[in-house]
Amino acid sequence: MAGFGLPNFGQLTEAFKKAKQIQQDAQKLQDELENMEIEGESDDEMVKVWISGNQLPLRVEVQENILNSDKEKIEQNILQAIQKAHELSTTTMKERMNDLTGGLNLNLPGFDNTDS
């Protein structure tokens, strides 16, 4: 600490540099997630959905022969595909955020920032 209880100017400058780098990396990550397409598929592979890394629905693909199934079967397949895509998207987002914030111990809710 320098005089008057203020931090050393060099330390302050370094902290600002790190903050700016984190901000730039966070924007880059946001762009990557936005452009990412994550696929989820029903157990019987009759329905596929794609969502972005930000969990924005992008498209749905349904196999022709599922249209002969009953309403409940179609709904179940759609739900399975959405849930799988969402789970993969969430996992991907957490991993990328962890890579970005690793070692900073930011204690962000929902993100494990420890190396356990």
Curated annotation (Swiss-Prot):
Location, primary (coarse class): cytoplasm
Highest taxon above the source species: Bacteria
Pfam family, one: YbaB_DNA_bd
Keywords noted in UniProt: Cytoplasm, DNA-binding
Location in or out of the cell: Cytoplasm, Nucleoid
Cross-referenced Gene3D superfamilies: Nucleoid-associated protein YbaB-like domain (3.30.1310.10)
GO molecular function: DNA binding
GO cellular component labels: bacterial nucleoid; cytosol
PANTHER family assigned to the protein according to its UniProt record, in alphabetical order: NUCLEOID-ASSOCIATED PROTEIN YBAB (PTHR33449:SF1)
Function: Binds to DNA and alters its conformation. May be involved in regulation of gene expression, nucleoid organization and DNA protection.
Subunit details: Homodimer.
Stated family: Belongs to the YbaB/EbfC family.
Name of the protein in its database record: Nucleoid-associated protein PMT9312_0020
Organism: Prochlorococcus marinus (strain MIT 9312)
Classification of source organism: Bacteria, Bacillati, Cyanobacteriota, Cyanophyceae, Synechococcales
